Curated annotation (Swiss-Prot):
Residues 7-154 form the UBC core domain. GO terms for biological process: protein polyubiquitination; ubiquitin-dependent protein catabolic process. It comes from the Eukaryota. Pfam families: UQ_con. This is Ubiquitin-conjugating enzyme E2 14. InterPro entries: Ub_conjugating_enzyme, UBQ-conjugat_E2_core, UBQ-conjugating_enzyme/RWD.
Length: 155
């Protein structure tokens, strides 16, 4: 079985320590079983969004050659959003293989997740039908998104 490079471990240790010492408001990060390569995260729905009052749990998993490959994100809290699918996948531009660079910090990734909660990006959706509804029938989108928060994101 392959093992992580010392530079991957150092980088993750540094980024994790930075996020614990200087947390991003409304984001919590913890290691899963003391594993630097698997984080459990929680994002609080921004107060100025349809996701206000929700707690959204997700995991960050890092490849052994991080930061040369992007982490994967899996949302475990169901969310009605054009950039998140029902399997927990997230469409985040900076994590796409052709865009991701080693210079991208995890702080930026987490801040962009909060930004997606604040303002969905219907131009780069994972769920085209929700993106279409967001563009063309915003009141219905907002109602369903709020209903999902009440039903799935209040714990």
């Amino acid at each position: 079985m392959a093992s992580a490079s010392p530079s991957s471990s150092r980088r993750l240790t540094k980024e994790y320590s930075d996020l614990r010492e200087h947390p991003i408001p409304d984001i919590r990060v913890n290691l899963v079983d003391d594993n630097l390569f698997h984080w459990a995260c929680t994002a609080l729905g921004p107060s100025d969004s349809v996701y206000a009052g929700g707690k959204f749990h997700f995991s960050l998993k890092f490849p052994l050659d991080y930061p040369f490959q992007p982490p994967t994100i899996e949302f475990t809290t169901r969310i009605y959003h054009p950039n998140f699918d029902s399997e927990g996948n997230v469409c985040l531009a900076i994590l796409k293989q052709q865009v991701f660079k080693p210079s991208i910090k995890l702080r930026s990734v987490l801040e962009q997740i909060l930004q997606l909660l604040r303002e969905p990006n219907p131009d780069d959706p994972l769920v085209a039908s929700i993106a279409e509804q967001y563009r063309n029938d915003r009141p219905s989108f907002d109602k369903i998104a709020r209903d999902y928060v009440e039903q799935f994101a209040k714990s």
